[in-house]
Each structure stands twice: as structure tokens, then as C-alpha cells.
From Swiss-Prot:
This is ATP synthase subunit delta. It holds the Pfam family OSCP. F-type ATPases have 2 components, F(1) - the catalytic core - and F(0) - the membrane proton channel. F(1) has five subunits: alpha(3), beta(3), gamma(1), delta(1), epsilon(1). F(0) has three main subunits: a(1), b(2) and c(10-14). The alpha and beta chains form an alternating ring which encloses part of the gamma chain. F(1) is attached to F(0) by a central stalk formed by the gamma and epsilon chains, while a peripheral stalk is formed by the delta and b chains. F(1)F(0) ATP synthase produces ATP from ADP in the presence of a proton or sodium gradient. F-type ATPases consist of two structural domains, F(1) containing the extramembraneous catalytic core and F(0) containing the membrane proton channel, linked together by a central stalk and a peripheral stalk. During catalysis, ATP synthesis in the catalytic domain of F(1) is coupled via a rotary mechanism of the central stalk subunits to proton translocation. Keywords: ATP synthesis, Cell membrane, CF(1), Hydrogen ion transport, Ion transport, Membrane, Transport. The gene is atpH. Transmembrane segments: none annotated. GO terms for molecular function: proton-transporting ATP synthase activity, rotational mechanism. Gene3D superfamilies: N-terminal domain of the delta subunit of the F1F0-ATP synthase.
Amino acid sequence: MNQEVIAKRYASALFQIALEQQQLDQIEEDIRAVRQALAENGEFLSLLSNPKLSLDKKKALVREAFAGVSAPVQHTLLLLLERHRFGIVPELAEQFIALANDARGIAEAVAYSARPLTDEELQALSDVFAKKVGKETLRIENIVDPELIGGVKLRIGNRIYDGSVSGQLERIQRQLIS
């Protein structure tokens, strides 16, 4: 079975538990922390896939490494470890965050700009573009792109809204050529 499908099933189960226990915010925060910890420590995943290490030792490592996370997240991690599917944790995190965002009417977005955007500018972008994608609000990550002359390029899911000066110049160039 496809890893993405498997991750989505585990994410859905964890999401249902989060809703039932009214811990959606806490579990989302924990799952983001787990995802970040695994991204920063790639050796940890390699260690857990080592066949020479017993399952009990692997469980002890996971309990110790993620002692601060909520019980549902820790139980999910241990279950994945038992079923030799710990490698899907990053994908599970992505799927869980998508489910949580969907439930709240939030979309993830990335804003590329020539300089860091202020909170007011990010809020203005969120207000305008959230309506365009049918969401209540956007959670925007701002990335400074020195190649942009000015303006903003916004990516929401697989759509890109290009309001950058360089993007406008490219469109003008295409119009002049054709």
C-alpha cells in the first residue's frame, strides 16, 4: 500500500482522537514538534530502522525523545514503531496538519518577498486571499527572496499568485513578443 495512503489513515485516526478529547491545538503543536525534531535529526530515523536494536530499546528511545508530547501522539509513535512504519511520521504530520487546517478553515501559504513582511501586511494578504481560496484565514510563512525586485509572490497549495515586479516584467515581455 502507498505510504501516503497509510499515513493518511493514521493521521485521520489521530485527528478523530484529537477531536474526541478536545485536544486539537495541543496535538497539532506536538505533531509539528515531532516533525521538526525528525527533520533536524535524520540519524534518529536511521537508528530506529536498525535491525540490531531491539524493539524495547527503540520504544525506550522514542519515549525518552518525545517525553513532552501528549499521550495520543506518543501512543501513535509507539504503534508506528511496532508496525515498522515509523518512517511515515513526517507524512503523517503533513496529513494531520492538513486535516486540522481544513477543520478550522485555514490554508497554509508561503509569501515570497524582497524584504520581510510586517504582521499587518501578512494579515492583509490573508484577508484578501483567504476568500479567494474559500478559507477563513491563511497561515502565511514569509520567505525573503533576494531575486525579487519588489512585490509579493504567494503560494497557496499548488496555486501561485504572482504580484512581484519581476513577474509583471515577464508578463509584459511575453505580451510584447507575441
